[in-house]
Amino acid sequence: MMIVLMLLLAYIVGSFPSGVIIGKIFFKKDIRQFGSGNTGATNSFRVLGRPAGFVVTFLDIFKGFIVVFFPLLFPVHPTGPISEFFTNGLIVGVFAILGHVYPIFLKFHGGKAVATSAGVVLGVAPILLLILAAIFFLTLYLTKYVSLSSIVAAICCVIGSLIIHDYILLVVSIIVAILLIFRHRTNIVRIFKGEEPKIKWM
């Protein structure tokens, strides 16, 4: 029962709509009605500006980071392989990612999983995250597409998991990569059509 409560709390933490709350409190704007209509960090930068965008990014990363340590904070006692699996910080992190993408507070219409996924990786493999961040920004510099850079970084996370032989991370990174590609499907179509907006600050 405690494991179920822990996973539920991770989902609720992930559901915290950082971009929407920052937009409404400080800018009197619902970012879902501007830009791409997305609730995540990229649209927050676009609609609310850089300072607010950085705050939203930090909060979304923190959501993924903090839940990784829930198994240490909750009195969970795995009694078998299944319960042990669900008390792994990475698996708990998946529930936060799902909360971010399908938040209960926003009728299950949320962000695209990038920043919160980065927070989960930060909690379990910070060096890997540094490498992925370098890949993300290099791709961003070359292409100017945030969506494409996110997808490339997610795929590289799968490859990195294979290299370091962390098979739970591999499973999680595959799930996240599939989810992230699915959430960016309209961006992918726009890239092929030449209609995807490019960043202008790099």
From Swiss-Prot:
One of its GO terms (cellular component) is plasma membrane. It is found in: Cell membrane. Catalyzes the transfer of an acyl group from acyl-phosphate (acyl-PO(4)) to glycerol-3-phosphate (G3P) to form lysophosphatidic acid (LPA). This enzyme utilizes acyl-phosphate as fatty acyl donor, but not acyl-CoA or acyl-ACP. Keywords: Cell membrane, Lipid biosynthesis, Lipid metabolism, Membrane, Phospholipid biosynthesis, Phospholipid metabolism, Transferase, Transmembrane, Transmembrane helix. It is a multi-pass membrane protein. Pfam families: G3P_acyltransf. GO terms for molecular function: acyl-phosphate glycerol-3-phosphate acyltransferase activity. One of its GO terms (biological process) is phospholipid biosynthetic process. Belongs to the PlsY family. The keyword Membrane applies. Probably interacts with PlsX. Its EC number is 2.3.1.275. PANTHER family: GLYCEROL-3-PHOSPHATE ACYLTRANSFERASE-RELATED (PTHR30309:SF0), INNER MEMBRANE PROTEIN YGIH (PTHR30309). Pathway: Lipid metabolism; phospholipid metabolism. The keyword Nucleotide-binding does not apply. This is Glycerol-3-phosphate acyltransferase. The chain crosses the membrane at residues 2-22, 54-74, 85-105, 118-138, 140-160, 162-182.
